[in-house]
Amino acid sequence: MEDSTEDIIKSFTLEQSPEIKPKPKSKTSDLTDIVYAMDDDSIKMKKFTIFDDKYDQNVSDSEHDLTPIKRKRQQQPPPPQQPSKFSSSIPQKPTLSPKKLASSPTKNYTDHINQLRSGPNSPKKYQEDENVRSLKYEIKRLKQEQNLKLENLQNKIEYLTKERDELQDQLTSMSFENDKLAKKNRSLSHENNHLTLENSKLKTKEYSNEDLQLEKNKLQRMNNTLRSERDELVKDFNLTRDKLKKYYDLYLHCQKNHVNVKSQRTEVGGDKPTADNISTNEELVDILRKLSEMMIDQNKMSEPIAAIEKDKPSEDKTSSPNFDSSKDAPRIVSEFLEEFIKRIVEEMSANSKSAPSSKQHINSEMYSQPNNFSNNTMPPSQSAAYIPSNSQPAPRPAAAAAANIYSSSTPNTNGYNQSSHSNDRPNTFELPRVERDHWTDRPPSERSTQSTKYMKMDPEEIRKLVVIITDQLKKEENNEKSSNTLDSETPIEKCQCCHGNPRNVNEPTNQKLCQSCLNKGDFTMSEFMGHSN
């Protein structure tokens, strides 16, 4: 029997389960490997359940009770009671149980069976040992199964850890990309703000363009008004020139009517200078014609500049138009001619009421100094020494007063050096001799105030006018000298009185004009007005 049980146990010995190698993990792996391993373990467990069913039907596959089997003990019947009726009368001996010996069987059969079963070679003891062995095998199997499951779980944990690390790496990379996108978003927001600012600037620039357009229109209107004013000034200049021509015709008419008066003219300290009346008149006409032509040329020079400014694009006309000094020349000359005509009328009316003056006084005192009349506003071509006729001597204090008036200490501001050009000026004509009013004999309230009027003029305007006239005269003189060969039989007398320069009035040599200056035919404005009457 022992051999048979050992054969049975050997047939059901627990084989060592082969080691399960974990499959390589991948991102797509799942729990299928663990499920397959559990199925293999369940197949192996069926062998042990069959072995348990053979030897113990009370043990199930899922329940393994390691406690020993409890058996019911047979209760021995209590010893029979002796009848008590004999106790009082007859004493009884105590019952002695037989001595139990190992070799000798007991009288009770059940006890004997129990004794046999509890022995080391009893079948029950052998069965209990087999159960213990089976339990040990079961424990070993469960431990192996547990170790396998733990290994699978460990592999799964490692796989999940690796997956977690990969996800962590992806998370860090995504966080890095997120930071880059955040930076890009900030840069785009900054660029958006910049574009918004540029848009607002463009809107404001549109408004500023409208303002500039309005300003441009305003400047164009101003330019048109200035052009219209310039046209009016040119028109006034033409009218003034026509008036001057009329007054000059009147002067010629008066000169023809007073031809007989010219024969009565005498010269102090010499003979009567000879001069052709027709040539001198033509010379004055030429001077006035040259002056008018020069003004017309300046007007023509200013017109192309205005045309160029008109042809310029409107964008360049943002600033106010500027007129150069050449455009101001017609205005300056026009104002001067207007004042010149007014002065002609006033002095003609004043000279009509004049009385004869002293000849000696005029010759000796009045022309002892260069004429500073009107604060040097008249050009040198219109200043000359004049010797009136029918003059009578005047008292000395009046002559001294006249000398003080004409010997002004005001410097020469017209920019013209009379001494340097005294020998180059051509001989001017001789005017008819008429009676002249000596205005110094009148009280100051009745004297003419043209000099103070011209003293109020701007010296710059006077200088411009004088320079223009003198330059034109010098050009004409040079042309005449080069074209016409004049007879120079009589030598030209040089100026000995320092005409046109500041002098000391107290010097006796500077009290009179030299013969050269007298022969030039220079005359003052007052004398010219007196002859034109």
From Swiss-Prot:
Residues 136-236 form a coiled coil. It is found in: Cytoplasm, Cytoskeleton, Microtubule organizing center, Spindle pole body. Keywords: Coiled coil, Cytoplasm, Cytoskeleton. GO terms for biological process: mitotic spindle pole body organization. Residues 83-94 have a biased composition (Low complexity). Its main location: cytoplasm. It comes from the Eukaryota. Disulfide bonds: none annotated. Residues 1-32, 53-130, 309-329, 349-453 are annotated as: Disordered. One of its GO terms (cellular component) is cytoplasm. Residues 18-30, 53-68, 309-318, 432-445 have a biased composition (Basic and acidic residues). The keyword Zinc does not apply. Residues 103-121, 349-392, 405-421 have a biased composition (Polar residues). Plays a role in mitotic spindle pole body organization, possibly at the point of spindle pole body separation. Required for mitotic exit. This is Spindle pole body protein CSA6. It comes from Candida dubliniensis (strain CD36 / ATCC MYA-646 / CBS 7987 / NCPF 3949 / NRRL Y-17841) (Yeast).
